[in-house]
């Protein structure tokens, strides 16, 4: 517990004066037994994982991945600036150095475990020769499928239409539930795109380096039009160093055969 609080202070705007407050907030989430536990972990994310084990052992959470993710996101929210503060910091830095502002946001998203760096490292990637040139094959092991218990529990859960989808702005800071991912430590950078408010966020389970998402602040059906290409060009001007593409405007893109 003390080691986790030390890392929170080192990676946030909290100061040493906040130590007792932080310890009490963490104990309220994982149980007071955490204060007695010894650990060899040193990194913020490993310390968070140790606290999740304590919470599981004392019955603060169940064994489902969803419950662990909800608590984990709540713990890592302690090192995540509030949306208003983060956006102010981002655009202040952007005025001096746009690439630095983007890099800082990316580092925060890794440091607070929104981008699942530890899980992504489990992915397998290799090159294989083809008649068209070398093809990169990736096996995604980082994004876990739901286990049968979670699927059964989700079916029994009361239907909710909030947030409207897993990408929209309503996810920022959302606690999460069995059938919707935890987003307490999730943040979105706001920016103007052709007179409308849009958002810039990273993908938690990246399929490629610095995999990010640009989205309209309003939940609207996907549509490909001339405006789509105008937006793409504006995006790459606003966010130097990145390239942008668009999803297809199909009713369903992706999904799981388990549900």
Cite the ranges covered by each PLM segment.
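Short Pro/Gly-enriched beta-strand edge/turn motifs at strand-loop
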Residues: 171-172, 243-245
């Amino acid at each position: 517990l003390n080691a986790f609080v030390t890392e929170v202070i080192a990676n946030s705007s909290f100061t040493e004066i906040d130590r007792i407050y932080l310890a009490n907030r963490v104990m309220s989430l994982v149980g007071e037994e955490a204060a007695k536990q010894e650990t060899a972990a040193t990194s913020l994310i490993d310390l968070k994982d140790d606290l999740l084990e304590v919470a599981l052992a004392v019955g603060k959470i169940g064994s489902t991945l969803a419950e662990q993710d909800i608590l984990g996101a709540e713990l890592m929210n302690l090192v995540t600036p509030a949306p208003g503060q983060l956006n102010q910091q981002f655009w202040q830095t952007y005025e001096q150095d746009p690439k630095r502002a983007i890099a800082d946001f990316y580092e925060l998203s890794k440091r607070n475990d929104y981008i699942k760096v530890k899980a992504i490292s489990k992915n397998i990637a290799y090159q294989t020769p083809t008649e068209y040139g070398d093809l990169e094959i990736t096996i995604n092991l980082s994004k876990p499928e739901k286990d049968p218990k979670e699927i059964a529990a989700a079916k029994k859960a009361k239907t909710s239409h909030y947030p409207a989808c897993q990408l929209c702005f309503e996810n920022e800071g959302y606690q999460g539930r069995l059938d919707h991912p935890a987003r307490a430590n999730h943040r979105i950078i706001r920016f103007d795109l052709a007179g409308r408010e849009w958002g810039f966020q990273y993908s938690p389970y990246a399929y490629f380096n610095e995999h990010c998402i640009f989205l309209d602040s309003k939940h609207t059906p996907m549509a490909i039009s001339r405006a789509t290409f105008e937006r793409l060009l504006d995006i790459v001007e606003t966010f130097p160093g990145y390239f942008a593409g668009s999803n297809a405007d199909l009713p369903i893109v992706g999904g799981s055969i388990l549900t």
